Design a protein with these regions (language model features):
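Phosphate/pyrophosphate-binding catalytic cores of soluble transferases and nucleic-acid-acting enzymes
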Residues: 1-309
């Protein structure tokens, strides 16, 4: 049997965890978590990390293993997953990867472009310029030095705009010149160097919009009742870390600063989480290789996977 990676994906709060555990038990597989925030050990409540009981049902990887001081990226995740799967496939024919971090899933399935290491002086300079001159100034600069990437980049995402300029000022070459990987409209990767030594089956989970939004609101209430504000208070000294630039913590930091009332923060968390869920679905729906199911269709999902093994 050809080694197969089953990727369970979908928006936040859709119900990935329970289905993933059921599939892991059925296929006798560990779980490769794919959440760029759950990988940090001090962010359990705000990221809805797996509970101790859930962790006992299957061996988990990439959960709570990093400190907030550790830098992590989709490129590092890709390499670590490939290294881990090479070992796990020696004893497992099927592995389950589950999560909603779009760039991380894409990195594992399709590979990631080989971006040069950024010069720290360049990074520091551009970070300062962003604060002093604002995003619009840097966007205008990117348009001049790399018009191709300017047309493509999310112009509201300061991190991505700055990163493109970091690459340009580090190498003297436009960021777009390093982006060699292309994808077809049907989602199939055409870069031969990125073909994986295992099959990939993508299972997308979706619910009706109002059902999903209701689950998101309920999850936020549960987080608050479980001590999200207290967790955020403990993380306040580290609030400048990139890992904490995350829905849930950002809003609670405003409460702790005295800027917002708790009720306002809770409503903002719900709203921002709903926005993020819509962004996830927009991203995933572009990939026509994903087979979509309601999370309660477990038997249909199992049959679909078995038919492709």
């Amino acid at each position: 049997m050809t080694p197969t990676l089953v990727v369970i994906l979908g928006p936040t709060a859709v119900g990935k965890t329970e289905l993933t555990l059921s599939l892991a038990e059925h296929f006798n597989s560990p779980v490769l978590n794919c959440d760029s925030r759950q990988i940090y050990r001090d962010m359990k409540i705000g990221t809805a990390s797996p509970t101790p009981e859930q962790l006992c049902r299957a061996r988990h990887y990439f959960v709570g293993q990093l400190s907030l001081d550790d830098y992590y990226s989709a490129a590092r995740y890709e390499q670590e997953v490939l290294s881990l799967t090479a070992e796990l496939f020696k004893t497992h024919s099927t592995l389950i990867l589950s999560g909603g971090s779009m760039m991380y899933i894409d990195a594992v399935c399709n590979g990631i472009d080989d971006i040069p290491t950024i010069d720290e002086e360049v990074r520091t300079t551009l970070s300062a310029r962003l604060k002093e001159e604002g995003l619009d100034t840097l966007l205008a600069e990117l348009r001049l030095v790399d018009p191709e990437h300017y047309d493509y980049v999310d112009k509201k995402n300061a991190k991505r705009v700055v990163h493109a300029l970091e690459v340009y000022y580090t190498t003297g070459k436009p960021y777009s010149s390093f982006l060699t990987r292309k994808t077809l409209r049907n989602g199939e990767n055409i870069s031969q160097s990125n073909i994986r030594p295992f099959n990939i089956i993508k299972i997308g989970l979706e619910r009706p919009r109002e059902e999903l939004f209701s689950r998101i609101n309920a999850r936020v209430d549960q987080m608050v009742n479980s001590g999200l504000l207290h967790e955020a208070m403990n993380l306040m000294p580290h609030r400048d870390k990139n890992a904490l630039n995350t829905v849930g913590y950002k809003e609670m930091f405003n409460v702790l600063d005295g800027t917002w009332e708790l009720a306002m923060a809770i409503e903002r968390i719900k709203k921002n989480t709903r926005v993020y869920a819509k962004k996830q679905m927009t991203w995933f729906k572009h990939d026509q290789s994903i087979a979509w199911f309601h999370p309660q269709e477990k038997e249909s999902i199992i049959e679909h996977i078995k038919a492709l093994l």
